[in-house]
Amino acid sequence: MALRACSSSLVARSAARSVQPFRPAAVRPARIAPVARKTATVVCSAATDAPAAPVAEAVVGEVKSGVAHLKFQRGSADKIRRVLDVIRGRSYEEALVLCEYMPYRACEKIIKCLMSAAANAKHNKGALKTKLVVSECFADEGPVLKRARPRAQGRANLIMKPTFHMTIRVEERAQ
């Protein structure tokens, strides 16, 4: 008898929980993220399927930018992102100074990639390093190296050694 009372209360509790109804993609609000293209058209559809209206059809001049990739580096992508979030949107020189004085090991790899991106912008597009801004930077997870550590009685523990891929883009500041 006690078992029946217990099971019926579980059913009542689970029925009382609020269950979110499934909403199809057309009804769900989309992330609003305008993307500027060469013709300066804003690409966005917020909660509707209507196409976005062009903002201005003026052709934007070529932006002097440089990109650098660092791939298959040992370390956690989360620890890299912690520093990348700080330097995003800052000037090249300010980002270098910040990374030099931060107490994280990830900063060494970020400085290497940042200097490479600035050198690419200067060499390929003729950009001035004093006018560069970190416009985009992100880190993705790479493959995980799996190793075994011997334990007692013939067992083994799995050791995970994560890797990451990092991309930094610098652009010349518009005056």
Curated annotation (Swiss-Prot):
One Gene Ontology MF term: rRNA binding
Transit peptide: 1-43
Disruption phenotype: Cells are erythromycin and tylosin resistant. Ery2 mutants (formerly called ery-M2) are cold-sensitive for growth at 15 degrees Celsius. Resistance and cold sensitivity are recessive to the wild-type allele. At least one mutant (ery2-4 formerly ery-M2d) has fewer chloroplast ribosomes than the wild-type.
GO BP term (any one): response to antibiotic
Locations listed in the record: Plastid, Chloroplast
Keywords: Antibiotic resistance, Chloroplast, Plastid, Ribonucleoprotein, Ribosomal protein, RNA-binding, rRNA-binding, Transit peptide
Top-level taxon of the source organism: Eukaryota
Pfam assignment, any one: Ribosomal_L22
Record-linked InterPro entries: Ribosomal_uL22, Ribosomal_uL22_bac/chlpt-type, Ribosomal_uL22_bac/org-type, Ribosomal_uL22_CS, Ribosomal_uL22_sf
GO cellular component, one term: large ribosomal subunit
Keyword NAD: no
Disulfide bonds: none
Subunit comment: Part of the 50S ribosomal subunit.
Similarity section: Belongs to the universal ribosomal protein uL22 family.
Record's function text: This protein binds specifically to 23S rRNA.
NCBIfam families named in the record: rplV_bact
Protein's UniProt name: Large ribosomal subunit protein uL22c
Taxonomy of the source species: Eukaryota, Viridiplantae, Chlorophyta, core chlorophytes, Chlorophyceae
